[in-house]
């Protein structure tokens, strides 16, 4: 849509797939059982695993991410229809950080509690979160031609981490004002 070069490379998508399908699944699986789940009525055998609230959250967050990322590609594209390597590294990191913060929203989904609730005791979750951040830093800093990245400045990192964390803070606001009613 915005030129000839894809905004994410195959190796970058492999990293995203690894952190979201493997690491994130491990992080969420490492969480202690939620005692509130046992208070819910059993679901029918033919009921979908993805509930309507879950579907809606996936849909709206997905649409918001796509709109934001498409706008970002437009913003980064120069007059010749190209995006420089620095901006591509920023785009890649923004993409990963959006997923990273949304992992915290997934942790808190349908609990009616903050994503920070019990976080200090969720060592598996914290370990995976740190692994994702550290892995992303090393890939962007040292990935070079393999990952089509250039090192980002600490200002870039602060801006990306701060701005993408809005995903978490917006989720926290929704959880605060939309407490689960029993």
Residue locations for each model-derived region?
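Membrane-embedded transport module
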Residues: 1-111
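C-terminal membrane-solvent junction of multi-pass transporters and transport-like membrane proteins
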Residues: 50, 54, 110-131
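Hydrophobic membrane-spanning alpha-helices of multi-pass integral membrane proteins
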Residues: 56-69, 94-98, 123-140, 162-165
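Interfacial loop-to-helix junctions that mark the boundaries of transmembrane helices
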Residues: 81-86, 119, 150-156
């Amino acid at each position: 849509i915005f030129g000839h070069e894809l905004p994410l490379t195959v190796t970058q998508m492999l990293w995203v797939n690894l952190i979201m399908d493997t690491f994130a699944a491990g992080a969420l699986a490492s969480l202690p059982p939620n005692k509130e789940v046992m208070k819910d009525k059993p679901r029918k055998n033919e009921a979908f695993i993805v509930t309507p609230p879950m579907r809606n959250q996936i849909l709206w967050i997905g649409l918001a991410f796509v709109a934001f990322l498409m706008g970002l590609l437009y913003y980064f594209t120069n007059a010749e229809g190209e995006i420089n390597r620095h901006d591509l590294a920023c785009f890649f990191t923004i993409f990963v950080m959006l997923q990273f913060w949304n992992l915290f929203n997934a942790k808190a989904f349908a609990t009616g509690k903050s994503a920070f609730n019990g976080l200090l005791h969720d060592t598996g979750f914290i370990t995976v979160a740190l692994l994702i951040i550290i892995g992303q830093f090393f890939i962007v800093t040292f990935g070079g031609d393999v990952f089509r990245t250039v090192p980002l400045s600490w200002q870039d990192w602060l801006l990306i981490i701060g701005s993408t964390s809005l995903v978490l803070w917006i989720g926290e606001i929704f959880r605060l004002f939309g407490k689960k009613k029993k």
